[in-house]
Amino acid sequence: MANPELLEEQREETRLIIEELLEDGSDPEALYTIEHHFSADDFDTLEKLAVEVFKLGYEVTDPEELELEEGGETVICCDALSECALNAELIDAQVEQLMNMAEKFNVEYDGWGTYFEDPDGEGEDEDDEGMDEDDDGVRH
């Protein structure tokens, strides 16, 4: 199970991200692409995690190398993507699920991010917006 202190830090970070997006005028009714970030020291370790995360229903990006600013060390990174409403409880459930998975595979969970959604955006399908009331955030 993920470290309770780290989970609490992530919960606080989630609320801060949501608050800042909404204060900046991001659309509260939009579906957001949530990018959960992972890193590992080697490709094989990250690949094992990526396969399991994909089986849970997340889209997983191709791994890429990233040189860290401090020390010049290179890590392998990927993201797990989901679409959901900007709802703290849904995102908390995903974060906990993915932090537990990362711990299982000895991979770093590096938080999540998303993008500003313009409430006046054109070309959006209204049927895709909003929160699915049956969505508990956990992917199966």
Curated annotation (Swiss-Prot):
Domain of life: Bacteria
Biased composition annotated in UniProt, kind: Acidic residues: 117-140
Pfam families tied to this protein: RraB
InterPro entries noted in UniProt: RraB, RraB-like_sf, RraB_dom
GO cellular component: cytoplasm
Disulfide cross-links: none
GO MF assignments: endoribonuclease inhibitor activity; enzyme binding
Ranges for region Disordered: 113-140
Keywords: Cytoplasm
Subcellular location: Cytoplasm
Primary role: Globally modulates RNA abundance by binding to RNase E (Rne) and regulating its endonucleolytic activity. Can modulate Rne action in a substrate-dependent manner by altering the composition of the degradosome.
Subunit description: Interacts with the C-terminal region of Rne.
Family classification: Belongs to the RraB family.
Protein name: Regulator of ribonuclease activity B
Source organism phylogeny: Bacteria, Pseudomonadati, Pseudomonadota, Gammaproteobacteria, Enterobacterales
Gene: rraB
